[in-house]
């Protein structure tokens, strides 16, 4: 199956940075996450990228399917080898979310682009991008972190189950013209490398401080798998801080969803 990605141009677009210099471009694949994990186990370098035009079994967080049609969006996974502790995987997710939000915001001037904790990027409260991070440890050290990213770039039509909750860069731009997916990919990848390096160098607090002003749902009533409360922000370790009738709690793994109600109900 042909695709319109030009691997040589992609490498030129990311020249000057480490991530993306080792690049595997595919027309179709079951999952770039699986491809990148295999590459990591075979010794792929830090910053190796698998980019696909189409995925047949793309996946997101919590085992959900990531719908991955060809010719419209970008789906890629990065092999990262950061010198961090195994417990830091959650913070890598937040650093990447911050990076993707920053890149997305640059393509949709005048629109609200925010991180929906912990791994989605919204434009005007509709999902534009998703992140999945999985780590491989050897002993007590991280051998590799596989970072999967999907960004809705040019898609304008959605399956019924996503209508009203998903959007794309093209849909949110006043011009409405199709965007250059290669440029979008290079931009997102560059921001990702920058923020993961920032986390490794400056620690979790640097990510938390930069991310909090860019979080969606702050001060709103939200639900998660087994609770309801007001989302107040994130803790030093990246956990979601929520206020419930029973007090303030920290959620390390949850899926927050907004509730149309008055947060004062829990005051």
How does the language model describe each region?
Residues 1-2, 18, 86-113, 123-267:
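Long, positively charged amphipathic alpha-helical accessory segments at protein N-termini or as interdomain linkers
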Residues 1-109, 264-267:
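N-terminal lobe of the biotin/lipoate ligase/transferase fold
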């Amino acid at each position: 199956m042909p695709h319109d990605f030009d691997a040589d141009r992609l490498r030129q677009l990311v020249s000057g940075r480490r991530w993306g210099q080792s690049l595997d471009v595919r027309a179709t694949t079951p999952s770039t996450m699986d491809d990148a994990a295999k590459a990591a186990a075979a010794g792929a370098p830090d910053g190796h990228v698998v980019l696909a035009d189409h995925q047949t079994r793309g996946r997101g967080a919590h085992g959900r399917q990531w719908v991955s049609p060809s010719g419209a969006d970008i789906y890629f996974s990065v092999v990262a080898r950061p010198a961090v502790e195994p417990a830091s995987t959650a913070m890598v997710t937040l650093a990447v979310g911050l990076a993707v939000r920053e890149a997305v915001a640059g393509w949709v001037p005048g629109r609200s682009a925010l991180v929906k904790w912990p791994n989605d990027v919204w434009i005007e409260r509709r999902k534009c991008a998703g992140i999945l991070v999985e780590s491989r440890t050897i002993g007590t050290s991280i051998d590799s972190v596989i970072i999967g990213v999907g960004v809705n770039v040019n898609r304008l039509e959605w399956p019924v189950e996503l209508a009203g909750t998903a959007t794309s860069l093209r849909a949110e731009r006043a011009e409405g013209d199709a965007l250059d997916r290669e440029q979008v990919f290079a931009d997102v990848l560059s921001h990702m490398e920058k923020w993961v390096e920032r986390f490794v160098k400056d620690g979790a607090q640097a990510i938390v401080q930069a991310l909090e002003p860019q979080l969606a749902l702050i001060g709103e009533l939200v639900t998660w798998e087994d609770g309801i409360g007001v989302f107040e922000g994130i803790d030093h370790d990246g956990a979601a801080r929520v206020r419930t009738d029973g007090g303030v709690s920290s959620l390390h793994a949850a899926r927050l969803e907004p509730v149309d109600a008055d947060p004062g109900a829990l005051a």
